[in-house]
Regions:
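Binuclear metal-dependent phosphoesterase catalytic core
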Residues: 21-38, 42-43, 59, 142, ...
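Active-site-proximal beta-strand elements of phosphoester/diester hydrolases
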Residues: 53-63, 146-156, 186-188, 238-244
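Core catalytic region of metal-dependent phosphoesterases/phosphodiesterases
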Residues: 69-139, 143-144
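Bacterial N-terminal signal peptides
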Residues: 5-17
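His/acidic metal-ligating clusters that form di-metal
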Residues: 77-84, 159-238, 267-269
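N-terminal active-site segment of His-dependent metallophosphoesterases
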Residues: 18-102, 182
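Active-site glycine-centered loops adjacent to acidic/histidine catalytic or metal-binding residues
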Residues: 61, 89-90, 119-120, 190, ...
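Stable alpha-helical elements in mature extracytoplasmic
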Residues: 52, 65-72, 88, 99, ...
């Protein structure tokens, strides 16, 4: 009788515990939408086709600041002039799977499409694998109107320099890929040169490739958590860095037919 009662007690405890079983934080168990960037790039290219003027928002480093990111989404949704949003990376703090899913679900509340770059924190643990599943390749490009956006993984430090980051082969291919479809270009990254995470040994080579893009307007970055507008090399190209979400700001860029690299048209918006 005692053995029988013990059996039923253990069975009840086991069944009760089944509902409490959780996945390991780095298990890359993905629920919900995957390949987000590809889906949204289709929308961006379709929505902007034929446009000669485009306007887009840039932000980044939303890790930890979920409330501020939710408020950013609400802020953008109030505007009717934004074509799309670029998230400059660092959606996660520790590369935990759920961090990516929480951020994805918040950003999916935008009324306009968005793309997300990979940041250095997103590479921690199994973060890169999660990023690739949820968002897609770490290097990608798209065309909005007549402007090509080249989005790069520049987080060399997180790979211990064991992989070609930046990927110069990808950058070179994108110089001519779909070249008849764009007149201007923008290069986007999480960590710009000379920020510690970037492989500064190849900074000049990187800039050589950057300046080969047709009608280069400027470069965007995140990572430092502070707004900056820097000319890093002797070529006049602006590297414009967004604040982290904790500061509740974002950048809005406008690229029109008359736009040039000498004077990028943008505003720092507080919300």
């Amino acid at each position: 009788m005692l053995r029988k009662n013990l059996y039923w007690l253990l069975l009840c405890l086991f069944l009760a515990g089944c509902g409490m079983i959780d996945y390991h934080p780095y298990d890359v168990h993905i629920s919900g939408e995957t390949n987000v960037n590809a889906h949204n790039i289709e929308k961006i290219e379709a929505n902007c086709k034929g446009k000669t003027t485009i306007r887009f928002a840039v932000m980044g480093d939303s890790q930890r600041w979920y409330d501020a990111t939710e408020d950013f989404v609400k802020e953008i949704n109030k505007r009717d002039s934004i074509d799309f949003v670029i998230h400059g990376g660092d959606m996660s703090d520790f590369g935990v799977t759920k961090e990516f899913l929480w951020q994805r679900d918040i950003m999916n509340g935008l009324k306009v499409p968005y793309v997300a770059l990979i940041g250095n924190h997103d590479c921690l643990g199994t973060g890169e694998e999660t990023y690739k599943t949820v968002f897609g390749p770490t290097n990608f490009s798209f065309i909005a109107g007549n402007v090509k956006f080249v989005c790069l993984n520049t987080n060399a430090l997180e790979y211990d320099y064991s992989e070609p980051i930046p990927n110069f082969t990808f950058m070179e291919e994108e110089i001519t890929n779909r070249s008849d479809e764009f007149e201007k270009s923008v290069v986007c990254m999480h960590a710009r040169p000379f920020t510690g995470v970037f492989n500064d040994n190849v900074a000049k080579v990187f800039q050589h490739y950057v300046t080969q893009y047709k009608g280069l307007q400027f470069c965007t970055a995140a990572h430092t958590h502070h707004f900056r507008d820097d000319i890093l090399f002797d070529d006049g190209i602006h590297y414009i860095t967004s604040d982290c979400m904790d500061y509740r700001t974002y950048l809005v860029f406008t690229i029109a037919p008359e736009s040039t690299s000498e004077n990028p048209d943008y505003e720092l918006v507080e919300y």
